[in-house]
């Protein structure tokens, strides 16, 4: 377990907007009556940078962000199980470049949808409870990791439908896993966090032969020699409550709990003592009225800024390149009153989407001077 080092005071950002950038509401869509839990732009394929996907109820919907604030629906998938409630969705990719969408939720089954053929490519079965988050390996987008209520994280090959590795056990999470994220440049490493208040860093390096084997496996996926990984390389207790979102920022980590703020901190791993090390909280990004769980933030592709919604339907956009932290702007509209469950920033941050508890999607676009 890492220790939080004292003596280094973290720097808190000011809630006075700098208005470095200004945004205006350009669209609002009422998708349905059910809560929308996820909205994600495609960062994997430059052909589809303007395409985003939403998840809510038993439905997954793809949209295109057009110029002048317009949004067009491209396709919609309704799960055969009407009791399904999707909590998370991620873009992935077939080995031939086909765009896939992977979605999971209360039923614990991950549906991998082939966008080109509009069919289910694979259904990934293995989790014993609901799936709270899916993230794709950007360097190898056939690989996804899933965080589950069953206290495990699983690594899958969406092309072959194989569960490669299961991260759980003696050193694993002790309650629901709420968020996962692959390291942006170290292909072997990812972070997970959850209701047990911890953030864990895991390494797949010594199990990479299993990953390679998953691409050439021709037998039944259920016969694949799935490996259990019981111990992370690092565990941190940065927060004192549920940790529901974590994202890598280079070798640093952005994470949030239910304490009205996002933290930027540095995990300092001890190479000779796996699981141990220290943690320095460097910067704090305040987010008022954000003390309930399952509110997730997002960044643009180049990690220049972060956008997060709150319980009142407002979005706070922080500059990640400034120290002390600078609030770029606060986005609000008199009709946006519902909890914002997730935001999505476009590749360059010029468009910000928010999906809400009341089934609405809001679009803000930067005002060009």
Curated annotation (Swiss-Prot):
InterPro entries linked: G-protein_beta_WD-40_rep, PcG_WD-repeat, WD40/YVTN_repeat-like_dom_sf, WD40_repeat_CS, WD40_repeat_dom_sf, WD40_rpt
Any one GO molecular-function label of the UniProt entry: DNA-binding transcription factor activity
Assembly: Interacts directly with MEA. These two proteins are probably indirectly associated with FIS2. In plants, PcG complexes are probably composed of a member of the EZ family (CLF or MEA), FIE, and a member of the VEFS family (FIS2, VRN2 or EMF2). Component of the plant homeodomain / polycomb repressive complex 2 (PHD-PRC2) large complex during prolonged cold, composed of core PRC2 components (VRN2, EZA1, FIE and MSI1), and three related PHD finger proteins (VIL1, VIL2 and VIN3) that mediates histone H3 trimethylation on 'Lys-27' (H3K27me3). Binds to ALP1.
SMART domains, per the entry: WD40 (SM00320)
Protein's recorded name: Polycomb group protein FERTILIZATION-INDEPENDENT ENDOSPERM
Chief place where the protein resides: nucleus
Localization terms from the record: Nucleus
Gene designation per UniProt: FIE
Source species: Arabidopsis thaliana
The organism's taxonomic lineage, starting at the top: Eukaryota, Viridiplantae, Streptophyta, Embryophyta, Tracheophyta
């Amino acid at each position: 377990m890492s220790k939080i080092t004292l003596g280094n005071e973290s720097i808190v950002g000011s809630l006075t907007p700098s208005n470095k950038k200004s945004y205006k509401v350009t669209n609002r869509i009422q998708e349905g009556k059910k809560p929308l839990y996820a909205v994600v732009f495609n960062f994997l394929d430059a052909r589809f940078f303007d395409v985003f996907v939403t998840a809510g109820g038993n439905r997954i919907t793809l949209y295109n962000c057009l110029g002048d604030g317009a949004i067009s629906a491209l396709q919609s998938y309704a799960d055969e199980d009407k009791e399904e409630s999707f909590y998370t969705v991620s873009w992935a990719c077939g080995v031939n470049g086909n765009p896939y969408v992977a979605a999971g939720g209360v039923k614990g089954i991950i549906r991998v949808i082939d966008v080109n053929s509009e069919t289910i490519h694979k259904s990934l079965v293995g989790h014993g409870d609901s799936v709270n988050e899916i993230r794709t390996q950007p360097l190898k987008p056939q690989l996804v990791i899933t965080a589950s209520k069953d206290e495990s994280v699983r690594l899958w090959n969406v092309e072959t439908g194989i569960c490669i590795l299961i991260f759980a056990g003696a050193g694993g999470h002790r309650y629901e896993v709420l968020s996962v994220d692959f390291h942006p440049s170290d292909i072997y490493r990812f972070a997970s966090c959850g209701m047990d208040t911890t953030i864990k860093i895991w390494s797949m390096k010594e199990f990479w032969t299993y990953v390679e084997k998953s691409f050439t496996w021709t037998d039944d996926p259920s016969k694949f020699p799935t490996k259990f990984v019981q111990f992370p390389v690092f565990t941190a207790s940065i927060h004192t409550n549920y940790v529901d979102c974590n994202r890598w920022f280079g070798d640093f980590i952005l994470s949030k709990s239910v304490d009205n703020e996002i933290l930027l901190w540095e995990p300092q791993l001890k190479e000779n003592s796996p699981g141990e090390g220290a943690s320095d909280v460097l910067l704090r990004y305040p987010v008022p009225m954000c003390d309930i769980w399952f509110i997730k933030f997002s960044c643009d592709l180049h990690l220049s800024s972060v956008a997060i919604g709150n319980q009142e339907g407002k979005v706070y956009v922080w500059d990640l390149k400034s120290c002390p932290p600078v609030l770029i702007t606060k986005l609000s509209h008199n009709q946006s009153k519902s909890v914002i469950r997730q935001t999505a920033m476009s590749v360059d941050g010029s468009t910000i989407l928010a999906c809400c508890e009341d089934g609405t999607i809001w679009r803000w676009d930067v005002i060009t001077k």
